[in-house]
Amino acid sequence: MFILFVCLLPFCKFKIPDKKYFLPLIGFSLSMGFGVIFFLNLSLGKATFVAPIIIGAQLAIPFAILASSIFLGEKVNIKQWSLILISFFGIFLIGYDPNLKGEIYAIFLCSISAFFYGIANVLSRYIKEIDVKFTNMIMGFIGFITILLFSIFSEGNTVSHLMNININTWLLLLHNGIVVSVIAHTSMFYLYKFYSINKVMPFYSLFPIFGLILTFFIFGEIPTLLSAIGSTIVIISVYRLQKIR
């Protein structure tokens, strides 16, 4: 989050937004900057395998569409409701895989992260009139402060932990901050200026395709039959969501 803040700060013209944007902006910043990052990293810390976490993160799509229906009044038809339920069923199948019994807690944490990601996408629609660089810069700042404070009070020795990070970890953090947060997330939130959530969010379904391929080549993870079936159900259902107009 700090990397995101530093990268976007030089490109932002600081201007206090209208009061009506205060709560949505703070909510967006806390959901995306703290909720998503915190629970996603917790889930990765508890997980033995990465692939189930990649699939679990796809729940952000149905969560976002459900939230957009409730808070924004975006129309969700019967086919979309059906596909949303099917996607949750796919996650349940993965959770019941005997080989992944130890991953249930990690998948649960990932689902919470996906929930916050969906909420963040809805809140971003409320602040779409604000420059996307500014909103993501504020999100990076608030996310950094909240995570730092949480680390100080819950873990302690935060400065010591930072000093002991090796060069490979710093490179991964730079990749996450620049490529994922600055380029990918900022670009996606920019699209909400022109398109509804149920049009943009389903393209997020491309994420597991690349993720599962990388986990195979990097970690050598081969899914079991039940996990493969559940993963296929999730990927196909969220892909079909973006085909419905």
Please tell me what each predicted stretch does.
Residues 1-35, 63-64, 116-120, 137-155, ...:
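Transmembrane alpha-helices of multi-pass small-molecule transport proteins
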Residues 12-57, 93, 177-195:
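Specific transmembrane alpha-helical segments of multi-pass solute transporters/efflux pumps
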Residues 42-46, 92-103, 154-173, 216, ...:
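Membrane-interface helix termini and inter-helical loops of multi-pass transporters
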Residues 43-44, 70-72, 76, 127, ...:
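Hydrophobic/aromatic residues within transmembrane alpha-helices
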Residues 99-126, 146-149, 214:
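Glycine-/small-residue-enriched transmembrane alpha-helix faces in small-molecule transporters
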